[in-house]
């Protein structure tokens, strides 16, 4: 009898076990009943009437933030990229203007972002057209051609793109080529350029080899005309007076964009800076190159060394200690109080409020496309604890004075470790152990890699 009961019990357990593991491709009543029981009935009613992030915001944490730094480089008035994706250009130029302002004791000064934007769009257009020529024998629906025609060019970029434009075309003061309606809000300009590029792209695919160059140059002439109508003529020569912060004239000269660059930008941007990445989905201490990531066709694609965050933080602190700002990009859409200018992983504990788990590692977030490199900025300060470890970082943003502290924003160290992607620093702050790695042959990453 006991044996029969035991066998029956084991059978029930087996049946229950099989039943519990049964796959269902649809939601049934049993599931929703379990969901309801799991959720419970004691809920915070504020979530029904208010923005979830307003309800979950840790206001005590927000109140604890300030801009106190152990080392701070820039106190400059912030710039404003407005409704454009030119953060990479703004942050690069913000780093370069800081050295110029400091050297000559200047007041507010900006390099022309419109000048850089003009040439960047023209160069990206040329790269697109050359890519079309390179792949014109492949079907139009081949992956590379689908990628090209889906978005022929964009207004985004990275430090290497800015370096290429500055080296090739020089720089000018903002007042020489100021911001225009279509630089501050470039959506329709970019759409128009893309329309023209798609049209000429199809012509190139159908053309004889002997006609390719003339068609390409006609396309670029049209793009140039569109840019001039919306952004103005880029100057070939101009007169400009260097003044100190009191308005006293130091010198007045006639410049070209290249002579202006040579006088006021002391760096060889191609060689004085090193580009790094923190991507835990790929092996560290290896070089990578992103296919078709350059703007100027004759320059190299964006190439970087992938390193752990500890290396990046060490170089970052060393850079700021020596009065040198650095360039970086991060997912600034994550765990942030935008107008308050605070970035902290503990700002909102929605998982705890809802009784669910939202935790993921950085590697998991990158692999699942949860996070991406969304915005490039210039780092200008850091607060260290008693042991010399970074606690928080101060950023010179490029969205005007309305966010944070007159446009400066603060990032918790843990936030930076979690959401930083790209990092560019002067070569003199790179540890000796990393320098030989920069000479290694990079592995090529495909154009459509979503992380880059």
Regions found by a protein language model. Give the residues of each.
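Papain-like cysteine protease catalytic cores
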Residues: 113-241
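Bacterial Sec-dependent N-terminal signal peptides
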Residues: 1-22
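Active-site signature of cysteine proteases
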Residues: 210-452
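Structural recognition of the beta-strand scaffold that forms the well-ordered cores
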Residues: 89, 115-118, 162-164, 173-176, ...
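N-terminal regions that are enriched for targeting/export leaders
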Residues: 22-77
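Second-shell loop/turn segments in exported
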Residues: 73-85, 147-153, 298-306, 316, ...
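Post-signal peptide N-terminal segment of secreted/secretory-pathway proteins
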Residues: 65-66, 70-135
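Coil residues (strongly favoring Ser/Thr
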Residues: 8, 20, 45, 67, ...
């Amino acid at each position: 009898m006991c044996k029969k009961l035991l066998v029956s019990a084991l059978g029930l357990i087996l049946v229950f076990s099989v039943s519990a593991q049964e796959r269902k491709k649809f939601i049934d009543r049993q599931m929703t009943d379990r969901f309801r029981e799991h959720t419970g009935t004691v809920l915070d009613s504020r979530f029904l009437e208010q923005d979830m992030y307003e309800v979950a915001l840790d206001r005590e944490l927000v109140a604890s933030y300030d801009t106190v730094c152990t080392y701070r480089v820039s106190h400059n008035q912030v710039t404003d990229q407005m409704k454009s994706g030119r953060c990479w250009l703004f942050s690069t130029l913000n780093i370069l203007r800081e050295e110029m302002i400091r050297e000559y004791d200047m007041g507010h000064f900006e390099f022309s972002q419109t000048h850089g934007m003009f040439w960047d769009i023209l160069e990206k257009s040329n790269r697109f057209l050359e890519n079309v020529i390179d792949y014109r024998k492949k079907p139009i629906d081949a992956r590379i051609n689908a990628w090209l025609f889906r978005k022929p060019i964009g207004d985004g970029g990275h430090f290497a793109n800015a370096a290429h434009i500055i080296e090739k075309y020089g720089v000018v003061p903002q007042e020489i080529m100021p911001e225009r309606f279509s630089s501050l809000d470039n959506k329709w300009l970019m759409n128009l350029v893309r329309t023209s590029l798609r049209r000429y792209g199809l012509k190139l695919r159908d053309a004889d080899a002997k006609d390719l160059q003339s068609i390409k140059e006609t396309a670029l002439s049209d793009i140039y005309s569109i840019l001039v109508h919306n952004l103005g003529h880029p100057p070939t020569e101009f007169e400009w007076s260097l003044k100190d912060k009191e308005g006293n004239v130091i010198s007045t000269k006639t410049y070209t964009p290249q002579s202006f660059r040579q006088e006021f930008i002391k760096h060889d941007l191609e060689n004085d800076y090193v580009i790094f990445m923190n991507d835990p989905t790929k092996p560290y201490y290896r070089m990578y190159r992103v296919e078709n990531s350059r703007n100027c066709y004759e320059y190299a694609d964006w190439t970087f060394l992938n390193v752990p965050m500890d290396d990046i933080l060490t170089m970052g602190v060393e850079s700021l200690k020596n009065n040198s700002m650095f360039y970086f990009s991060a997912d600034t859409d994550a765990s942030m109080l935008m107008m308050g200018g605070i970035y902290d992983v503990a700002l909102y504990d929605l998982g705890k409020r809802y009784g669910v788990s939202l935790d993921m590692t950085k590697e998991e977030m990158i692999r699942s496309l949860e996070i991406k490199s969304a915005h490039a900025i210039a780092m200008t300060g850091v607060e260290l604890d008693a042991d010399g470890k970074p606690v928080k970082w101060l950023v010179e943003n490029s969205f005007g004075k309305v966010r944070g502290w007159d446009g400066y924003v603060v990032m918790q160290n843990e936030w930076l470790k979690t959401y930083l992607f790209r990092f560019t620093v002067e070569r003199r702050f790179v540890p000796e152990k990393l320098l030989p790695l920069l000479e290694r042959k990079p592995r090529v990453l495909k154009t459509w890699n979503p992380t880059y």
